[in-house]
């Protein structure tokens, strides 16, 4: 069970505890962490300044020397892992980590059945041609470009649904959170790969250009036809699954070094300490397959004439 699932189970109980005890945000977080397995909270007291070992090595201070986090009542909380070492990541917390469902079918394909489907499918097929010609078997570079693009659809969709929810004074059915989770998960893929390889200047230039063009194009597509946008993303994720399958084949064939997994990957996907690059690519491929299903699912809902809020949102779906 993931920390996120545990949180959803405990949330009603903890919420009532917060209301009855008057705990603040920091106190609530400490109360939550105390219920999580294999996680130990060293300090969560927000009622008094944090001092000593609970302060970061170089805290940000105001002009008169006050530590900003303490001044605003948001002191850092120290969390330890089961082996006693400190949790060192600020970009995600223990309850954001999870064990991926690697049993998902990675060969599933949505067969285009109408004009919109065919347009989405051939758009993706056309876009992948220059990418394949440029990267060929340079899997790490290809993966980094792929993840900078793959993190865009969830953010755009979540943002537009957020604005729609505010504009219409109605709930989104959980789809805002689901799509933003997808975007964050894709970003974590990128953060993992940059631990293994740094892009060259021209690759950064390509990312800058491609991301700018794709963000605006996808934004317009989502405004005009969300079902088309989700279908495009579904096919993009199918290609992502295929590219990671090729990556795995080359690792298995000895064409790409199976180096140790970076620490961030071990903590994020709760991998064993001796995990390798192959293990990382394997779980990332599973993530992409889940994103594929989410977006084809979202498109199918809208093709049937329904709004996303009418169907259960796949929150925490990995």
UniProtKB/Swiss-Prot annotation:
Principal location listed in the UniProt entry: mitochondrion
Annotated catalysed reactions: 2 a ubiquinol + O2 = 2 a ubiquinone + 2 H2O
Annotated residues for binding of Fe cation 1: 147, 186, 189, 288
GO molecular function: alternative oxidase activity; metal ion binding; superoxide-generating NADPH oxidase activity; ubiquinol:oxygen oxidoreductase activity
Alphabetically ordered keywords of this record: Disulfide bond, Electron transport, Iron, Membrane, Metal-binding, Mitochondrion, Mitochondrion inner membrane, Oxidoreductase, Respiratory chain, Transit peptide, Transmembrane, Transmembrane helix, Transport
GO CC annotation terms, alphabetical: mitochondrial inner membrane; mitochondrion
Cofactor details (free text): Binds 2 iron ions per subunit.
Compartments, as annotated in UniProt: Mitochondrion inner membrane
Domain of life: Eukaryota
Recorded family membership: Belongs to the alternative oxidase family.
Miscellaneous note of the record: Unable to fully compensate for the loss of AOX1A when electron flow via the cytochrome pathway is restricted.
Function: Catalyzes the cyanide-resistant oxidation of ubiquinol and the reduction of molecular oxygen to water, but does not translocate protons and consequently is not linked to oxidative phosphorylation. May increase respiration when the cytochrome respiratory pathway is restricted, or in response to low temperatures.
Name assigned to this protein: Ubiquinol oxidase 3, mitochondrial
Organism in which the protein naturally occurs: Arabidopsis thaliana
């Amino acid at each position: 069970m993931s920390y996120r699932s545990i949180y959803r189970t405990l949330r009603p109980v903890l919420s009532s505890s917060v209301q009855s005890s008057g705990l603040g945000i920091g106190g609530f977080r400490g109360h939550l962490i105390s219920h999580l397995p294999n996680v130990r909270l060293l300090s969560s007291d927000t009622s008094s300044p944090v001092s000593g070992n609970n302060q970061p090595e170089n805290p940000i201070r105001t002009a008169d020397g006050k530590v900003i986090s303490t001044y605003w009542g948001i002191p850092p909380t120290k969390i330890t892992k089961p082996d006693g070492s400190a949790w060192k990541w600020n970009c995600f917390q223990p309850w954001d980590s999870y064990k991926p469902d690697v049993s998902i079918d990675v060969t599933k394909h949505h067969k285009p059945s109408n004009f919109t489907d065919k347009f989405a499918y051939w758009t993706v097929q056309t876009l992948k041609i220059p990418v394949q010609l440029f990267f060929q078997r340079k899997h790490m570079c290809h993966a980094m470009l792929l993840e900078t693009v793959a993190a865009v659809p969830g953010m755009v969709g979540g943002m537009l649904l957020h604005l729609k929810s505010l504009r219409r004074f109605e709930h989104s059915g959980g789809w805002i959170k689901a799509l933003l989770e997808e975007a964050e998960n894709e970003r974590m893929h990128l953060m993992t790969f940059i631990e293994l390889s740094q892009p060259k200047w021209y690759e950064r230039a390509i990312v800058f250009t491609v991301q700018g063009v794709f963000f605006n194009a996808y934004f317009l597509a989502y405004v005009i036809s969300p079902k088309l946008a989700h279908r495009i993303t579904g096919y993009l994720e199918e290609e992502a699954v295929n590219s990671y399958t090729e990556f795995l084949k080359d690792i298995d064939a000895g064409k790409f070094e199976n180096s140790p997994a970076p620490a961030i990957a071990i903590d994020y996907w709760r991998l064993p300490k001796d995990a390798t690059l192959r293990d990382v690519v394997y779980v990332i491929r599973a993530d992409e397959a889940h994103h594929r299903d989410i977006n084809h699912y979202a498109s199918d809902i809208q093709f049937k004439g329904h709004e996303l809020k009418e169907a259960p949102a796949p929150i925490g779906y990995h």
